[in-house]
Amino acid sequence: MNTKILSKDKDPMGAAILDYQKSGRAGRLRVLSSMFEEDEMPVKHLFRKVEEMPMLEQKALQLTKGRILDIGAGSGCHTLALQEKGLEVKAIDISPLSCEAMKLRGVKDAECINLFDPHLSSGNHSEEHQKTLSEENQKQFEGGFDTILLLMNGTGIAGKIENLPALFLRLKALLNPGGQILIDSSDLKYIYENEDGSFDINLNGAYYGEVDYQMIYKDVKGDRFDWLYVDFPLLKSIAETCGLHGELVAEGEHYDYLARIF
């Protein structure tokens, strides 16, 4: 699992986001994969407003509560929507260019930091320290989150199915008591579906939701990276091995879904 920060010369999506933020337009953001034909991500889509978001994203925003952590925030579209509702949101991304764009857009708390960086912590303190704090300051320094958002295929950052438990345990450590994780993904089995409704999936091979991608923007070429799509039953099962519960909140039109983990 990637635990680093992107360098600017290896950050095509960040470059595209910052270009669009500064000029209102951007070039082609190319998406390559060994599994699919070359595709293109519309940069304007990364700046969508609430009413332009897919139903699953809108539902996730409706379910947020308390102090929120938006992971892989990109251009900050989800964070800004929540800020407008008066909610406290911390946006993080491993792209320094995306974080620069977020700040230009008005995101109040945007930090270029990796989710697994120990400096991003729940902020839990010893009982002795907590006793020295007023009730208001305890809340301020507690540092945990009531809602953690991972949208636009939030399971992707795990990269491989074997890394999903580590991701869930890290998120669990960042949650306040009673907190929740809102995460979306897709079941890629439709790629292997036959006309008769059966599926040609190699059960002895790698998990079928493991994909590799590479992005290119102008002369900025990113490194190839692993990206994970997970079917809900497996996501729920892995969450349970981590001492968490998984709940299917809503399903989209094409094997995509929103889950709540708590």
Where are the predicted features?
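SAM-dependent methyltransferase
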Residues: 177-236
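Conserved SAM/SAH-binding beta-strand->alpha-helix loop
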Residues: 95-96
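Conserved alpha-helix/loop element of class I SAM-dependent methyltransferases that forms part
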Residues: 48-67
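Conserved SAM-binding strand-loop segment of SAM-dependent methyltransferases
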Residues: 106-119
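N-terminal auxiliary segments of SAM/dcSAM-dependent transferases
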Residues: 1-31
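A short SAM/SAH-binding and catalytic strip from SAM-dependent methyltransferases
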Residues: 145-165
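A short glycine-rich, Lys/Arg-flanked "PGG" loop and its adjoining helix->strand segment in the class I
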Residues: 164-177
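A short acidic, Gly/Pro-enriched loop at the edge of an enzyme's catalytic core
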Residues: 121-125, 139-148
